[in-house]
């Protein structure tokens, strides 16, 4: 089957009413790759069947966070389930986790993150290869992820290398847009260009929306330089939203899970990927995202 287009534990204390991480029922599981006897899987959520001719719909593909060496795909079940109710096909992916960072790696020019990106590229190609069966438009795929997963989604769709030679031929990994939840970019990636988003970022970068807590150091040391480069390159649609006073992974729990999803929904509507208004209600507690100029 073909290609498809993220969330991390909060690092600051939240009120007890918001303590539980959002979740949703499991999607339908598919194997997108077999590697060394291990099945790599993704879960897909489909919209309810409608009467009449079926038109292909946009597809979302999400990659979980966890520091490249941890995390699970259930992080984006809530997001995928929601967007399936809005008429899209949405997938959340399991990928090969990176080995733990070691002192030796600091001396190497190759990042441990490479294995994650290779699997992500395989998942996107599988999504595109099976677009007809899945009911998606391979030219309207939205990629994304949270923290490490945000980084993985960005590099899997921009770096020309790190390909699995066993992937189906004739399918690239480009996408039409991004949903990015505090993507973890680092100046330390510069030693390995194939995992460094700043070196892969070009003027034709697709529309994106990124969410950060104002107290998240990953924003200051990673996304700020990328956002500045986007502006200098003339990237036309780079939406940057900030949750004041919040830290890394804030979007994993309510009310911010719904606040960010509502903003993502409106972003996709502006691009023509979705119709109507968000079906989630804004929190009565008044949490809002500020738009970065």
Model-found features: residue ranges?
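C-terminal catalytic histidine-bearing segment of alpha/beta-hydrolase fold enzymes
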Residues: 43, 224-227, 233-293
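Short amphipathic alpha-helix adjacent to the substrate-entry channel of hydrolases
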Residues: 73-93
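Alpha/beta-hydrolase active-site loop
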Residues: 109-132, 262
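N-terminal cap/lid segment of alpha/beta-hydrolase-fold proteins
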Residues: 20-55
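Primarily recognizes the serine-hydrolase "nucleophile elbow" in alpha/beta-hydrolase
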Residues: 122-203
